Amino acid sequence: MAGGGLALDVSSAGNIDAKITAAVVMSCIVAASCGLIFGYDIGISGGVTTMKPFLEKFFPSVLKKASEAKTNVYCVYDSQLLTAFTSSLYVAGLVASLVASRLTAAYGRRTTMILGGFTFLFGALINGLAANIAMLISGRILLGFGVGFTNQAAPVYLSEVAPPRWRGAFNIGFSCFISMGVVAANLINYGTDSHRNGWRISLGLAAVPAAIMTVGCLFISDTPSSLLARGKHDEAHTSLLKLRGVENIADVETELAELVRSSQLAIEARAELFMKTILQRRYRPHLVVAVVIPCFQQLTGITVNAFYAPVLFRSVGFGSGPALIATFILGFVNLGSLLLSTMVIDRFGRRFLFIAGGILMLLCQIAVAVLLAVTVGATGDGEMKKGYAVTVVVLLCIYAAGFGWSWGPLSWLVPSEIFPLKIRPAGQSLSVAVNFAATFALSQTFLATLCDFKYGAFLFYGGWIFTMTIFVIMFLPETKGIPVDSMYQVWEKHWYWQRFTKPTST
């Protein structure tokens, strides 16, 4: 029996050696590009909220506080209304992700991604033309619905289309596009920072990535699993043949037979209540992991760092332009780390990257806290010299690198691959909803936490990183290389979760 810290031998779970074809690559690139809109929004928000014309128009009280010479550096931008601008998107995303479970089950993954793209596009246009707070928040809500739909559908699409052996690498593409969106947004913020209407350009250009991914989705087919679950057997066969290649007809028939078996369970599940099904004892391991992992991802502190990096860097002594450059460097390092993870994820596995990244992030959070403590102190009235400020940037870059190969991509990958088809749309929706809820809570409270906890805020996140690393060591089984429809075996062989699962594939 495998222990909590050991990999499981489930190589017999599937003997289908699906090849990488041009159709697989193109379909996965298009689906992964849904991450662009999420990343762009993460990157654009923090930069826009430091632009003087934006603050003058919508948040003059924040601008007044920032201009006061004796303001505590920890509390410069502590405004619930300002954070509401950023975090309102995630309330809408939470609602949309729950609705998306029904949409993906009834209309497919592809349709849900297209709907998300259109919704995000309209939200971007409203934000770019915003004349008051009401328009600004309304646009953010539409953006939230857009990312709620795409964040639910895209990871599932990738897990269902990618060959099992390379599922990790293809699924990480979603996180890579998120990071590319962040980097692009940082560059745009830097370019528009000095313009009077720069904030309008930054917010309005969110329509560009939305248009790119929406148009791309029009040219790909839905996943075979989704088509079968909706009773479209012939279309599923055609889609699978296109993805795997006509020269692999034997493997296609074998894989199709396995998908048909799984789809029958999904069709039967339509008559069952969502909560009744997913709360069954046999799905307890899936549910716990799918809820805990997105919560832990946000408790690393990475998203609030991405939102408020320009604010943070300005607080420790950088000017507006240098702060945006430092934020760009942070995003670029994260992207590089993500690209590295695509090359090693299916070799070293999920657990190793989770643990290695967790240790690195923990050390960096402690180091940043110590640095802030000895420079600006607990009162926040001290002055941080440029050398120390640069050190903070370096530490946060190392931290971002650790996140980029661990909790960044794997928090999207693991929940999308662990659920059986019967509850996969509902399970992924729940996981994404939890992610949005945690993001909202932390983004809404981060600036207040920084103001109240001072440098202790970084120790707070460090404590959570320690906790989540222990959780991975003890309770997360290895899933690399296992076909998604044979994933039940990892739970049946896990030292703890086996007590909840039955020795069947249902």
Curated annotation (Swiss-Prot):
InterPro entries membership: MFS_dom, MFS_STP/MST-like_plant, MFS_sugar_transport-like, MFS_trans_sf, STP/PLT_plant, Sugar/inositol_transpt, Sugar_transporter_CS
Ribosomal protein listed as a keyword: no
Residue spans crossing the bilayer: 20-40, 81-101, 117-137, 141-161, 168-188, 201-221, 287-307, 325-345, 352-372, 390-410, 430-450, 456-476
Keywords, alphabetical: Membrane, Sugar transport, Symport, Transmembrane, Transmembrane helix, Transport
Gene3D superfamilies documented for this protein: MFS general substrate transporter like domains
One annotated Gene Ontology cellular component of this protein: membrane
Disulfide bonds: none
Origin: domain of life: Eukaryota
PROSITE patterns according to UniProt: MFS (PS50850), SUGAR_TRANSPORT_2 (PS00217)
Keyword Transmembrane helix attributed: yes
Topology in membrane: Multi-pass membrane protein
Cytoplasmic side: 1-19, 477-506
Single GO MF annotation: symporter activity
Subcellular location: Membrane
Coarse class of the protein's main subcellular location: membrane
Annotated function: Mediates an active uptake of hexoses, probably by sugar/hydrogen symport.
Family, as annotated: Belongs to the major facilitator superfamily. Sugar transporter (TC 2.A.1.1) family.
Name of protein: Sugar transport protein 5
Native source organism of the sequence: Arabidopsis thaliana
Gene symbol of the encoding locus: STP5
